[in-house]
Amino acid sequence: MAKIQLNGKEVVIKSNYSILDLLKKYKLANKKVAIEHNGIIINKTNYRKKYLKDNDKIEIVHFIGGG
Protein backbone atom coordinates (compact mmCIF):
# COMPACT_ATOMS: atom_id res chain seq x y z
CA MET A 1 0.00 0.00 0.00
CA ALA A 2 1.07 3.59 -0.64
CA LYS A 3 -0.25 6.96 0.51
CA ILE A 4 -0.43 9.65 -2.16
CA GLN A 5 -1.83 13.15 -2.34
CA LEU A 6 -4.58 13.27 -4.98
CA ASN A 7 -5.82 16.77 -5.71
CA GLY A 8 -4.79 17.78 -2.19
CA LYS A 9 -6.38 14.82 -0.37
CA GLU A 10 -4.58 11.82 1.08
CA VAL A 11 -5.52 8.58 -0.68
CA VAL A 12 -4.29 5.04 -0.04
CA ILE A 13 -3.62 2.95 -3.14
CA LYS A 14 -2.32 -0.54 -3.86
CA SER A 15 1.34 -1.13 -4.56
CA ASN A 16 2.37 -1.11 -8.24
CA TYR A 17 -0.48 1.26 -9.14
CA SER A 18 -0.02 3.17 -12.38
CA ILE A 19 -1.52 6.50 -13.33
CA LEU A 20 -3.79 4.59 -15.72
CA ASP A 21 -4.97 2.38 -12.82
CA LEU A 22 -5.77 5.53 -10.83
CA LEU A 23 -7.75 6.99 -13.74
CA LYS A 24 -9.70 3.73 -14.10
CA LYS A 25 -10.50 3.71 -10.37
CA TYR A 26 -12.07 7.17 -10.67
CA LYS A 27 -13.71 6.39 -14.04
CA LEU A 28 -11.57 8.98 -15.84
CA ALA A 29 -9.62 6.65 -18.15
CA ASN A 30 -11.71 7.59 -21.20
CA LYS A 31 -12.02 11.29 -20.35
CA LYS A 32 -9.87 14.19 -21.47
CA VAL A 33 -7.60 14.87 -18.51
CA ALA A 34 -4.32 16.52 -17.65
CA ILE A 35 -2.12 14.79 -15.06
CA GLU A 36 0.58 16.40 -12.96
CA HIS A 37 2.87 13.97 -11.10
CA ASN A 38 5.13 15.60 -8.51
CA GLY A 39 5.01 18.89 -10.41
CA ILE A 40 5.60 17.42 -13.88
CA ILE A 41 2.92 17.12 -16.56
CA ILE A 42 2.69 13.50 -17.76
CA ASN A 43 2.05 12.67 -21.40
CA LYS A 44 -0.91 10.35 -21.99
CA THR A 45 1.39 7.78 -23.63
CA ASN A 46 3.12 7.33 -20.25
CA TYR A 47 0.03 6.78 -18.06
CA ARG A 48 0.48 3.00 -18.20
CA LYS A 49 4.26 3.16 -17.57
CA LYS A 50 4.31 5.66 -14.70
CA TYR A 51 3.91 3.91 -11.34
CA LEU A 52 2.97 5.72 -8.15
CA LYS A 53 4.84 5.44 -4.88
CA ASP A 54 4.45 6.61 -1.31
CA ASN A 55 4.17 10.42 -0.90
CA ASP A 56 3.66 11.13 -4.61
CA LYS A 57 1.55 14.19 -5.40
CA ILE A 58 -0.97 13.84 -8.22
CA GLU A 59 -3.21 16.54 -9.65
CA ILE A 60 -5.91 15.49 -12.10
CA VAL A 61 -7.81 18.07 -14.09
CA HIS A 62 -10.62 16.88 -16.32
CA PHE A 63 -12.34 18.97 -18.91
CA ILE A 64 -16.06 19.57 -19.06
CA GLY A 65 -17.74 21.07 -22.09
CA GLY A 66 -19.99 24.05 -21.73
CA GLY A 67 -20.71 27.43 -23.06
Predicted regions and their residues:
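Cytosolic Rossmann-like ligand/nucleotide-binding regulatory domains
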Residues: 37-38
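Short amphipathic, charge-patterned alpha-helical segments
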Residues: 18-27
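Eukaryote-biased recognition of intrinsically disordered, low-complexity regulatory segments
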Residues: 1-9
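Short alpha-helix capping/helix-loop boundary micro-motifs
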Residues: 42-47
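Loop/turn positions that initiate beta-strands
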Residues: 55-58
